[in-house]
Amino acid sequence: MKEDCSPSSHVPISDSKFILKSELLSLLKTYNCYHEGRSFQLRHREEEGTLIIEGLLNIAWGLRRPIRLQMQDDRERVHLPSATWVPERLSYLQKDASPQDSKVPAEEPSTQPANKGEVSRDGSGPLQEEEEEVPQLMRTKSDASCIIQRRCKSRAPGEAQKIRRHRFSINGHFYNHKTSVFTPAYGSVTNVRVNSTMTTQQVLTLLLNKFRVEDGPSEFALYTVHESGEQTKLKDCEYPLISRILHGPCEKIVKIFLMEADLSEEVPHDVAQYIKFEMPVLDSFVEKLKEEEEREIIKLTMKFQALRLTMQQRLEQLVEAK
């Protein structure tokens, strides 16, 4: 790894560190051999002399505090009751419907007034065309279908609006608002598709957007955690995918964790080597260190006492010589 190198022959690791392109490609080959036949193999290409690597990056959850998810789901549709809905229509349709009506395909266009309460899931606002047409026609195919439609339509506007506000999704699943705050299982792994030009902050933003987390990327950090317990924070200017390749493909040895920025700290190698020991063993280490410290103190004390004695004797000799 060198500094201030030509971009044609080197690839940046951070804003000030570089690695030889040939060396990185060799590590990439090893990485892909490890993941052979799996979706975690990485692809690479060159654009204007710049090497770009892309693929899936595994990130483990290492949060201690709960996170809050966005309450709105852009893809959810909520049907609000129509202002022109009359409950008596149900009995009217059941009474006057002919046997042929029960065979009408569900895809036929409706002829009822528009239901203006339908909300788009994609966040683009109300569906304009559906506001001008009837979203659903009360069918007489079965009594059950009519009852279902009636239940859907009979909600008060305030109740339906409350349901719409109190639902959200994560990974396509809808949850009640009471579960919008949760803590992912420690060590559970997710992944995002990234490339080697994406910085730590960009990867964090991508991951949080994927799970619709309300908290901003500044509240989190990415750490490389070694099997030994050594823990190193990825700087904002670093590239997580490059870091993953440099640490090797085996996640039993090194994992990339998402952690809180204010609750996590780096653990150097000198400290990490003691992490896995039990408390009695650590206590014995401390006792031995104290004993060694006492011996060193005694040794230094005796040394300086001897030096002081020598200096005093010399001073006395000089005084007598005068």
Curated annotation (Swiss-Prot):
Residues 96-140 are annotated as: Disordered. Interacts directly with activated KRAS in a GTP-dependent manner. GO terms for biological process: signal transduction. Keywords: Cell cycle, Phosphoprotein, Tumor suppressor. This is Ras association domain-containing protein 4. Residues 271-318 form the SARAH domain. The modification Phosphoserine is found at S142. Gene3D superfamilies: Phosphatidylinositol 3-kinase Catalytic Subunit, Chain A, domain 1. Potential tumor suppressor. May act as a KRAS effector protein. May promote apoptosis and cell cycle arrest. The keyword Cell cycle applies. The lineage of its organism: Eukaryota, Metazoa, Chordata, Craniata, Vertebrata.
